[in-house]
From Swiss-Prot:
It holds the Pfam family NAC. Residues 131-141 have a biased composition (Acidic residues). This is Nascent polypeptide-associated complex subunit alpha. The lineage of its organism: Eukaryota, Fungi, Dikarya, Ascomycota, Saccharomycotina. The keyword ATP-binding does not apply.
């Protein structure tokens, strides 16, 4: 029987393996009582590291201690927070792009898209002409680390003069210079 053939909400029992059977028999001998209705158990460790067990089997002893069975998965809260922030930023960017597209009222017919691409390629050709002019003129590199210039030239494949201008424009900030040139 495949997964597609099992109706949703059907009562499906999983056959436990030999070790699980032995552990459950020992639990019954110890007098532990099963607690129903628990959907998730988490154990927190230093550094926002969390071990999570989804759909656990939880037993309670007379002394008040708990025994938990299930598959533990490491759940890093810092990673979850970073993912949530990235997802939120992506949603905001999509909303902003949708608002910009709606406000501009641009026609997205094939002819309009072709015209936009041609316009962009013409503008790109003009910037290439500017880059050719940058190659011919000397640029003052004082106050800028030559290794930074070399790295930007290597990463963006622009002229050395363009890299120096971008670094000076952003006060030596390599990240912003790279973003501008790429």
């Amino acid at each position: 029987m495949s997964i597609e053939e099992i109706p949703q909400g059907a009562d499906v029992s999983i056959v436990p393996n030999k070790n699980e059977k032995k552990a459950k028999e020992l639990i019954k001998k110890l007098g532990l009582k099963q607690i129903k209705g628990i959907s998730r158990v988490t154990f927190k460790q230093r550094g926002n590291l969390i071990y999570a067990i989804d759909a656990p089997e939880v037993y309670r002893s007379q002394a008040g201690t708990y025994v938990v069975f299930g598959e533990a998965k490491v759940d890093d809260m810092n990673q979850r927070i970073a993912e949530a922030q990235a997802q939120q930023a992506q949603q905001e960017a999509l909303q902003k792009a949708a608002a910009d597209a709606g406000a501009a009222g641009d026609d997205k017919s094939p002819e309009a898209i072709t015209a936009d691409l041609e316009k962009a390629s013409l503008q790109g050709g003009e910037s290439n002409a500017d880059a050719a002019e940058d190659d011919n003129e000397e640029v003052d590199e004082t106050g800028i680390n030559p290794k930074d210039i070399d790295l930007i030239v290597e990463q963006t494949r622009v002229s050395r003069g363009s890299a120096v201008k971008a670094l000076k424009k952003h006060d030596g900030d390599m990240v912003n210079a790279l973003m501008e040139l790429s």
